[in-house]
Amino acid sequence: MAFASLGQLQAGGIVLSPDPFLNSRSKQLAALASAYTIPAISELRFFAAAGGLISYGIVDIALSRQVGIYAGRILKGERPADLPIQQPTKFELVVNLKTAKALGLTVAPSILARADEVIE
């Protein structure tokens, strides 16, 4: 099992990339990370809400809104090749202090001050 191997290697942490397979298993992954005392972070906010240590990534609602605007423009006849490339501009940081405490970690006050949400 991957988490057991990470625990044996005394890994300092793990970063989970956004992936539909992993996203649907956020609770299980957060529980495994906790069981093996491995700090885990992800880009998606619901990972921290599910028990992961930290999430930092795009705001899904803002990105979905932009996708809808582009879809509307294409449906009205604009060519996709003519639309400018855009990148996300809104990001959020979520810190799960309950998980940090369970892992024996202290989150720096500067991180907490920048967090959009702190789960206690």
Name each region found by the language model.
Residues 1-120:
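Short hydrophobic alpha-helices and adjacent helix-cap/hinge residues
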